[in-house]
Amino acid sequence: MKRLIFAAVITSFLFASLAQAAESFEATACRSGTATMVQASKELLVMGFELKGMLQSNTEMLNHASEVCVGTIKRIGEETIQMGFCKYLYPNGDINVVEWDGARNGGNWKYLLGTGKWENIKGGGTWQMIKRAKPIVEGTFQNCIDLKGSYELPK
């Protein structure tokens, strides 16, 4: 009986050590973008866009990442739906890729891929528009979003 209890405790310990606890974080991404209009009318707006910027985070592991995002927006009346993908490049060359969706000013995101320290990453969270700035150059737009979420990495 003692062996059985000992084996159960050891097994639990081994499985617990294989998975790292989820790390929560907050970050801000500020970026500039360009859009390609597909349809622009009172009834329907459809466009694609590309954003380039930088991520700043309260977690050093996520801080100072370069960002590129592509996405689409569809607006029918007052309803806005957007979706896309972002790639983050860290100072050491590692990357991660996320998928996101949402309404006009916020939504959800999740990790799809990671390399190096991000290999086999899992997690996701929410994004929220915090600021839109007046375009610095005609044909561009600038904004900042807040990201909140968590990630898990295997040990």
For every predicted segment, state its role:
Residues A21-K155:
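Beta-strand-enriched cores of mature, soluble protein domains
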Residues F15-A21:
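Sec/Tat signal peptide C-region and signal peptidase I cleavage site
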